[in-house]
């Protein structure tokens, strides 16, 4: 039986890390978070990398991490919200695993991220406006790479994980 890796995409606050941990546990896969891998490798936080290297420096590190991580088997990978901006990342995600887009409304994302200081793009006067713009810009790219789209709003983590597991079983991926 082929044991494909699962890649979670979606905006910040959609639940990729939370869902990813539960999903990995159910599948007996390793859970990895691309942002955490970058922080571990550099010894710096994502906001610190943004401050020192700018968004372009962070995106270069993210591209290298996604290339490396997507080559591993039997992992559940939570990607950063902007990972899909890079065409090579989209190609690697699509071709190397099963991609799940965790979708949520802007209002829900605002609620989930409002106290999180570890999200450099939201450190503005109007995080809601930033999230709307990001969803408008990135939404079609999330859709483009997704094998499965799951609405995470007002649904428990366990229900989201069950929906993913059901689809993986239906497509004989697990």
Swiss-Prot record:
Chain sites annotated for binding substrate: 35, 59, 81, 138
Cofactor note: Binds 1 Mg(2+) ion per subunit.
Catalytic activity: shikimate + ATP = 3-phosphoshikimate + ADP + H(+)
Organism domain of life: Bacteria
Binding positions for ATP per the UniProt entry: 13-18, 119
Leading EC class: transferase
InterPro entries from the UniProt entry: P-loop_NTPase, Shikimate/glucono_kinase, Shikimate_kinase/TSH1, Shikimate_kinase_CS
PANTHER family noted in UniProt: SHIKIMATE KINASE (PTHR21087), SHIKIMATE KINASE 1, CHLOROPLASTIC (PTHR21087:SF16)
The name this protein goes by in its record: Shikimate kinase
Organism: Hydrogenovibrio crunogenus (strain DSM 25203 / XCL-2) (Thiomicrospira crunogena)
């Amino acid at each position: 039986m082929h044991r494909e890796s699962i890649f979670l995409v979606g905006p910040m606050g959609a639940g990729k890390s939370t869902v990813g941990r539960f999903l990995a546990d159910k599948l007996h896969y390793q859970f990895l978070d691309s942002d955490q891998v970058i922080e571990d490798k550099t010894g710096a936080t994502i906001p610190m990398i943004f401050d020192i290297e700018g968004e372009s420096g962070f995106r270069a590190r993210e591209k290298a991490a996604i290339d490396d991580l997507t080559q591993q088997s039997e992992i559940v990978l939570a990607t950063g919200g902007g990972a899909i901006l890079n065409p090579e990342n989209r190609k690697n995600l699509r071709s190397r695993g099963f991609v799940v887009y965790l979708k949520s409304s802007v209002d829900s994302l605002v609620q989930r991220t409002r106290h999180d200081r570890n999200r450099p793009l939201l450190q503005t006067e109007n995080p809601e406006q930033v999230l709307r713009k990001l969803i408008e810009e990135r939404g079609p790219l999330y859709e483009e790479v997704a094998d499965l789209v799951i609405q995470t709003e007002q649904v428990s983590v366990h229900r989201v994980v069950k929906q993913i597991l059901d689809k993986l079983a239906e497509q004989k991926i697990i």
